[in-house]
């Protein structure tokens, strides 16, 4: 492992240790605002298990404890099967090690949190490797700067400490983008499938395959002609696109088969259970989150949106960087206009242009303020997480 990769891993481990310590100490000291975790865990309740079982982990755990990892209630359709399957697998491994005959909640939570931490360690490292590919003229130190910033000040540290979508999706999404750019298209397709199995918007990773394999070669030659080995390229672009959409397609097909024709979404022009469930249970939809009661969530996530928009307006644009800025812009629009806006705090780690801009403008007041805010808010978020207080 190279010098800067070792430095990034060491920084990530140190910062994770700080955030995990805050969560565990706060969990041991503070009582939960919501006692659902204690009720569900019963005798398996302790500071560690209680600190893991928060927010979306309830939904993941419900599916993980199901014999086949599937959903039981329709609101669980909003969550992709990747994390529940990972949790179930971890729980079964722990049960085997302990020579137990049953799958327990505590085994499942603790083992999956351990694995999620190992996987999320790769996120800053993959950002570094991706930066080296996108900006090959950068020195190793320049490429490491965004990764070190991500490692030191993620806006939502708890989501990287537990079996959550961010802990798994972020490194896999960054890995997908890097591998596609490097030409490892088959491996990238497998990684994209794994990433898309954890989060619905993983289907957007298909854009990297289409752009890098088919579009960028044409833009580089500046001639409207087929790139070399066009049949081979079309095949791999199709494979990557299918791999990116397959998990979402499967979950929507399963939901349609199990809920239709009774469910209201079945008669829509595009009968997607995902958008129906998001709107029904989380009030997602075009500008539906834009109301007075949500002002605190807008204010909490404002720094991410401000820096994210500034990064779009001041891009370090190259042909290799273009798809990252397109996905970055699309993600911000979807979050701001169609989703729970505070989710941007968790999504930030999967937005390379944000970290590229901050690292390139550390002499600006906005970048310095963002770093200071991220560090402070990250610690506060750990305490709020331990006490089972929003934002999720």
Identify the residue ranges that each predicted region occupies:
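Start-transfer (signal-anchor) and selected internal transmembrane alpha helices
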Residues: 1-42, 235-236
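Membrane-lumen/periplasm interface segments of specific transmembrane helices
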Residues: 18-31, 52, 193-316, 320, ...
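Short hydrophobic/aromatic helix or loop-helix immediately within or flanking a transmembrane segment
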Residues: 51-103
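Transmembrane alpha-helices of multi-pass, membrane-embedded glycan-processing enzymes
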Residues: 79, 83, 87-91, 106, ...
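Transmembrane-helix signature of polytopic, membrane-embedded enzymes
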Residues: 99-111, 122, 127-153
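Short acidic/glycine- and proline-prone juxtamembrane loop motifs at membrane-interface regions
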Residues: 155-169, 343, 347
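Membrane-interface transmembrane helices that cradle and orient dolichyl/undecaprenyl
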Residues: 176-187
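Transmembrane alpha-helix segments characteristic
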Residues: 317-338, 343-356, 365-377
């Amino acid at each position: 492992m190279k010098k800067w990769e070792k430095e990034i891993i060491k920084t990530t481990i140190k910062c994770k240790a700080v955030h995990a310590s805050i969560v565990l100490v706060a969990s041991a000291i503070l009582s939960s605002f919501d006692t659902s975790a204690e009720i569900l865990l019963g005798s398996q309740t302790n500071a560690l298990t209680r600190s893991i079982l928060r927010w979306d982990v309830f939904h993941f755990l419900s599916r993980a404890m199901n014999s086949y990892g599937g959903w039981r209630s329709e609101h669980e359709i909003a969550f992709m099967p990747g994390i529940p399957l990972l949790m179930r697998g971890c729980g079964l491994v722990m049960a085997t090690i302990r020579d137990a005959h049953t799958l327990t909640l505590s085994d499942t939570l603790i083992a999956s949190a351990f694995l999620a931490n190992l996987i999320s360690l790769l996120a800053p490292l993959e950002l570094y490797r991706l930066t080296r590919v996108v900006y090959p003229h950068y020195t190793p130190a320049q490429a490491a700067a965004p990764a070190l910033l991500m490692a030191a000040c993620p806006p939502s540290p708890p989501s990287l400490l537990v079996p959550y979508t961010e802990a798994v999706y972020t490194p896999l999404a960054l890995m997908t983008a890097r591998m596609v750019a490097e030409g490892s298209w088959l491996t990238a397709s497998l990684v994209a499938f794994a990433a898309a199995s954890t989060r619905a918007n993983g289907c957007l990773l298909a854009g990297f395959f289409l752009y890098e394999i088919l579009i960028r070669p044409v833009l580089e030659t500046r001639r409207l002609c087929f790139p070399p080995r066009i049949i081979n390229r079309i095949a791999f672009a199709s494979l990557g696109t299918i791999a990116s959409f397959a998990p979402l397609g499967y979950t929507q097909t399963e939901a349609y088969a199990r809920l239709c024709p009774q469910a209201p979404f079945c008669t829509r022009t595009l009968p997607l259970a995902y958008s129906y469930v998001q709107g029904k249970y989380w009030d997602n939809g075009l500008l539906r989150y834009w109301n007075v009661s949500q002002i605190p969530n807008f204010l909490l996530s404002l720094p991410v949106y401000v820096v994210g928009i500034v990064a779009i307006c001041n891009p370090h644009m190259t042909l290799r960087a273009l798809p990252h800025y397109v996905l970055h812009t699309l993600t911000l629009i979807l979050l701001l206009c169609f989703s729970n806006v505070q989710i941007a705090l968790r999504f930030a780690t999967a937005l390379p242009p944000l970290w590229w801009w901050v690292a390139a403008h550390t002499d600006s007041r906005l970048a310095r303020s963002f770093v200071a805010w991220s560090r402070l808010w990250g610690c506060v978020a750990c305490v709020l997480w331990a006490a089972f207080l929003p934002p999720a």
